[in-house]
């Protein structure tokens, strides 16, 4: 079974780790069979499961429901879960909603934000809830950003992100997740902190890589993000012992991350 201690050990050893989003029991079981290291019950479910155009409508009850589905069916992966939009405005809200999600089976709680989360991170960590802080492109703030855009491109923005990372790590964050930032910035962050860093659209040098399950299976509509690769139709999966199955796509993703063949330069932002 993968734990936070396992991920910290992997970081020290230079061994990459895999992460996929998941929302139900059957896919969770397949991910266990494929040895995927970590699973995120993400508020991305608002878009890929519920059909919304953003993550904002997702509720705590939604996360609790899907976390239970996953945690009952996967006993291998470390399970992360989001607190959704406006569910942790106050420390009191954060404590109450963290309790609900962890009682459903989450082992790490993910929050979106920066240094302003420091007090909350410390409080939740002291209460026994490991925290992953999500920085860079944070989908819950899409209306503030004016759309889904690469973050940390200017010197000032990069310095601000690095400062935020140091603040939340000092406050007790157990993991960092960077989304859609230049690969060079993600590399600098990963080297600057002793906690594991997960990337999505953040280059190849982070400690772990995460993708939305539907994206990496090619189950998408409209424009596909630069960092997405379709592992289901990948020739390596088609020719593998899995014979092109979904479980094979999960295994190929996991192995590609560990071996360093994903992501490639074409998947990153400069």
UniProtKB/Swiss-Prot annotation:
Entry EC no(s): 2.1.2.11
Disulfide bond is among the record's keywords: no
Source species, domain of life: Bacteria
This protein's name: 3-methyl-2-oxobutanoate hydroxymethyltransferase
Coiled-coil stretches: none
Binding locations of Mg(2+): 43, 82, 112
Pathway per the UniProt entry: Cofactor biosynthesis; (R)-pantothenate biosynthesis; (R)-pantoate from 3-methyl-2-oxobutanoate: step 1/2
GO molecular function, one term: magnesium ion binding
UniProt GO cellular component terms: cytoplasm
Top EC category: transferase
Annotated source species: Psychrobacter sp. (strain PRwf-1)
CDD domains from the UniProt entry: KPHMT-like (cd06557)
Subunit and interaction comment: Homodecamer; pentamer of dimers.
Recorded family membership: Belongs to the PanB family.
Active site per the UniProt annotation: 179 (proton acceptor)
Residues annotated to bind 3-methyl-2-oxobutanoate: 43-44, 82, 110
Reactions that this protein is recorded to catalyse: 3-methyl-2-oxobutanoate + (6R)-5,10-methylene-5,6,7,8-tetrahydrofolate + H2O = 2-dehydropantoate + (6S)-5,6,7,8-tetrahydrofolate
Role played: Catalyzes the reversible reaction in which hydroxymethyl group from 5,10-methylenetetrahydrofolate is transferred onto alpha-ketoisovalerate to form ketopantoate.
